[in-house]
């Protein structure tokens, strides 16, 4: 009996190793194909299975942080209080604010701020959300409370999008970011109403159609938030992926970049990475 158990354990270990080496080889090949760097962290919240690739390497998180900021604000504000209004001044407006630029001199609700940030990736909306939380220091404090001492918010929009590989400013690792997303949104303190509100925004978001959504089976549901920094071809997507018939998501973080500051990203890199990683689940 002991020998049988030993053989079963060995078989499981070898199977896991083969699985890991399989996706690692495919992702290494993708890095060569696109002359890029890939970082991946995936967590099946149902089984606890993880898939990692360069998961402790730092990348610019760019606009994917809007999901975290929105979730932190939604922890603080009950759903029936999201009608609170904030005033928008001309000086508040930064580049790429397609919704908030229409509100100069007017008031906007917290609910509409989150909708603008998550659905249109409105940069001014993200800044206002951070300020409603209490500023960048409060965001960092909440991250530390969640056990995340890696994700490093320093700047507001749009400066946070100027990534430098020599700096840790506004960067994270796929593993740290993915675990924080899980603790904040999938298994966090959000009320039922606020969680549904945020995930519905991510599910109906169209900006990620060429990213993780493009790499998973069409009958999967994908609630995502994409991001793209201005430098080093930094292109990201973070998502809660729901396989058909599964109510507990797979948290999937894909961060990518390149070596040259002026390089341009390719969305196919992320969709092909997602396709490779999801074979493991």
From Swiss-Prot:
**GO process terms (BP):** beta-lactam antibiotic catabolic process; response to antibiotic
Instruction: Give the matching InterPro entries.
Output: Beta-lactam/transpept-like, Beta-lactam_cat, Beta-lactam_class-A, Beta-lactam_class-A_AS, Membr_lipoprot_lipid_attach_CS
Q: Which reaction does it catalyse?
A: a beta-lactam + H2O = a substituted beta-amino acid
Active site at which residues?
Answer: 63 (acyl-ester intermediate)
- Coiled-coil intervals in this record? none
* GO MF annotations, alphabetized: beta-lactamase activity
Q: One Pfam family name from the record?
A: Beta-lactamase2
Q: Which UniProt keywords apply?
A: Antibiotic resistance, Hydrolase, Plasmid, Signal, Transposable element
E.C. number(s) listed in UniProt: 3.5.2.6
Where does this protein hold substrate?
225-227
Q: What class of enzyme is it?
A: hydrolase
Signal peptide residue numbers? 1-24
Q: Does the keyword Transmembrane apply?
A: no
Q: What else is known?
A: The class A beta-lactamase family has a specific amino-acid numbering system, sometimes called Ambler or ABL numbering and often misspelt as Amber. A multiple sequence alignment was used to derive a consensus sequence and then the consensus was numbered taking into account insertions and deletions. This allows use of identical numbers, e.g. for active site residues, despite differences in protein length. UniProt always uses natural numbering of residues, hence there appear to be differences in numbering between this entry and some papers.
Q: What family, per the record? A: Belongs to the class-A beta-lactamase family.
Provide the protein name: Beta-lactamase
The organism encoding this protein is Staphylococcus aureus
């Amino acid at each position: 009996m002991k020998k049988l158990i030993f053989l079963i354990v060995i078989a499981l270990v070898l199977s896991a190793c083969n699985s890991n080496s399989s996706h690692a080889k495919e992702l290494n090949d993708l890095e060569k194909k696109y002359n890029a760097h890939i970082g991946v962290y995936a967590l099946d919240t149902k089984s606890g299975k993880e898939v990692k690739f360069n998961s402790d390497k730092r990348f610019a998180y760019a606009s994917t942080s809007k999901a975290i900021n929105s979730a932190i604000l939604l922890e603080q504000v009950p759903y029936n209080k999201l009608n609170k209004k904030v005033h928008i001044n001309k000086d508040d407006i930064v580049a790429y604010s397609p919704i908030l630029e229409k509100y100069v001199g007017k008031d906007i609700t917290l609910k509409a701020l989150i909708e603008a940030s998550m659905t249109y990736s409105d940069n001014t909306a993200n800044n206002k959300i951070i300020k409603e939380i209490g500023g960048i220091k409060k965001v960092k404090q909440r991250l530390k409370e969640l056990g995340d001492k890696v994700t490093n918010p320093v700047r507001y929009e749009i400066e946070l999008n100027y990534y430098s590989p020599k700096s840790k400013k506004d960067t994270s690792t796929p593993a740290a970011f993915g675990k924080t997303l899980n603790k904040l949104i999938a298994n966090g303190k959000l009320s039922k109403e606020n969680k549904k509100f945020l995930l519905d925004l991510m599910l109906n978001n169209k900006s990620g159609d060429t990213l993780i959504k493009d790499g998973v089976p069409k009958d999967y549901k994908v609630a995502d938030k994409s991001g793209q920094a201005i430098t080093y071809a930094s292109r990201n997507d973070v998502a809660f992926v729901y396989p058909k018939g599964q109510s507990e998501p797979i948290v999937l973080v894909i961060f990518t970049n390149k070596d040259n500051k002026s390089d341009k990203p390719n969305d196919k890199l992320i969709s092909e990475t997602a396709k490779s990683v999801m074979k493991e689940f």
